[in-house]
Amino acid sequence: MCIRDRSYGNEFTRANNPLECGFKRYCHLEDGIDYIGREALLKIAEDGPERHIMGVTFGGEALSGVAVPLAVIAEDGTVVGEVTSGIWSPRLGCNVGMSMIARGHWDAGTRITIRDSDGKLRDGTVSSLPF
C-alpha cells in the first residue's frame, strides 16, 4: 500500500469539496471561467476550508490496514478527524495514515491520539504528506 495518493471513497467523498482535498489547482478560481459551484469555491477559498487531508504517524502494534475510519482526537478529547487509510511503515518504524482533520488541528507536529478499531488509544502526530 502506498500512503501518498488520495483515494475517492477513502480520503474524500462527494461530501468534501476540492479545496479540502488538496485539488485547488484544478478549480480554476483565478481565470474567470464561470462554472456551477465556482462562487461557493471562491467563498471557501476566501474563508479557508474547514478540513484538510494530512498525514498522521502513530505508535502501537503494527496495523495491517484500516478497514473502518479511526478517530483522531485532540489533546482536549475532542474528535477532530478520522484516519481513512493507514498501515505499518517498516521504513519509519511506526503506523502511518492519511486523515481528514479539522482546521486548527492540522498543523504538522500537532500531538493527537488515534482510537483504533479495538478502542485502544495510540499517541500520534500530524505530519505533512508525503511521509
Map each language-model feature to its residues:
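Conserved, structured C-terminal
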Residues: 4-131
